[in-house]
Amino acid sequence: MAKGQSLQDPFLNALRKEHIPVAIYLVNGIKLQGQIESFDQFVILLKNTVSQMVYKHAISTVVPARAIAAIPHVESD
């Protein structure tokens, strides 16, 4: 598993499990808001009034609305 994935997955999964609202900023500056419904290697499903599939390569930043519980530490190689 790539190091990037080993950091992304626990972070996104904690946001999903705890139903934490997030602001997702895209590389073109657009701000999307909602809750993470699901995600995989390439996309995030963001739910607000509708569900949106957002490609990860278009995402600049994911900002949780509040602090999240501790994410398990992943050892680097």
From Swiss-Prot:
GO cellular component: cytosol
Record has Repressor as a keyword: no
InterPro entries the record matches: Hfq, LSM_dom_sf, Sm
UniProt KW RNA-binding keyword: yes
Annotated GO biological process: regulation of DNA-templated transcription; regulation of RNA stability; regulation of translation, ncRNA-mediated
Entry GO MF terms: RNA binding
Pfam families named among the record's database cross-references: Hfq (PF17209)
Domain of life: Bacteria
Keywords annotated in UniProt: RNA-binding, Stress response
Domain Sm, residue spans: 9-68
CDD domains in the record: Hfq
Disulphide bridges: none
HAMAP family listed in its UniProt record: Hfq
Family: Belongs to the Hfq family.
Assembly and binders: Homohexamer.
Family annotation (PANTHER family): RNA-BINDING PROTEIN HFQ (PTHR34772:SF1)
Function: RNA chaperone that binds small regulatory RNA (sRNAs) and mRNAs to facilitate mRNA translational regulation in response to envelope stress, environmental stress and changes in metabolite concentrations. Also binds with high specificity to tRNAs.
Protein name per its UniProtKB record: RNA-binding protein Hfq
Organism name: Psychromonas ingrahamii (strain DSM 17664 / CCUG 51855 / 37)
Lineage start: Bacteria, Pseudomonadati, Pseudomonadota, Gammaproteobacteria, Alteromonadales
